[in-house]
Amino acid sequence: MGKLATLNGILKDEASQMKLNVVHLCSSVNAKTIDLALLKATSHTSNNPPSDKYVTFLQSTIDTCYGPDTVDAILHRLRVTTDVCVAAKCLILLHKMVKSESGYNGEDSLRNNINHRTLIYTQGGSNLKLNDLNVNSSRFTRELTPWVQWYKQYLDCYLSIAEVLGITPNIKEKNEDKRLETQRVSSYPMDCILKQIDFLVELFEHISDRPKAPQSKLNKIVIEMTELMVQDYFSAIRLMRIRFEELNVRVAKPNELVPVLEKLENCKEGLSEFSWRSKYLIADFWYLVSKLKDM
């Protein structure tokens, strides 16, 4: 950051702090602490992603009575800011809030958090709104802006998948997680499984269409966005594989999958950058895609 931009950021953060003190004159200590942590996590004076210290604290509120207030406060800050970095940090925070449920417990875990998620995504409509961002304040913001715009659309897609699947797409490489999900999918009708696959493929397409990496290799905000996205990619592979295997058991030749498989293969090159992160998972998945296509 340049000296002028840094000074401007400091003044904005101090103004936000003063406003917070006035707003919370009659509020509870917990409400003020949440808003203060949000300001610290999304400060104007740093080009780094939200600090783990504040992220962990904000995540800890999600399963409490303050959870909706936390999500609503992040959404409000996202809507009113014109700062590209602050908007990026708000989106990262929202992504982490959604992913923060403890373990994978199927539909019940999502049902407990439904009020939090529906603050962001309700009945097909997204509450993720970007303000008119000050794009040209620096080279850093010019590089970051296309990522912020893409990431907002990506989160819309991610949340719509949670709506259709009935679970947050955050399944890990655990036998119990896969057993629970396989059991759920086995009870679904064919058209339901095909619809879910369509939405998962859309996530693949969004990942494949991400912006080019910034020339500044040390853009830690983009690195954080990418890391969260890759985690989602691996979860989506596990979810899709379970559905492909279920269809493979039910029908000899699932013709309805042909267009979907072609879309997937069109994404393959754009996703190859991440193959080294989980070679066996990736290789097994693309082998299954080829096998289904050749049936």
Curated annotation (Swiss-Prot):
Compartmental location: Membrane, Clathrin-coated pit; Golgi apparatus; Cytoplasmic vesicle, Clathrin-coated vesicle
The protein's name: Putative clathrin assembly protein At5g65370
Lineage, opening ranks: Eukaryota, Viridiplantae, Streptophyta, Embryophyta, Tracheophyta
BP GO terms, sorted: clathrin coat assembly; clathrin-dependent endocytosis
Keyword terms, alphabetized: Coated pit, Cytoplasmic vesicle, Endocytosis, Golgi apparatus, Membrane
One Gene Ontology term, aspect cellular component: Golgi apparatus
GO terms, molecular function: phospholipid binding
Domain ENTH: 26-169
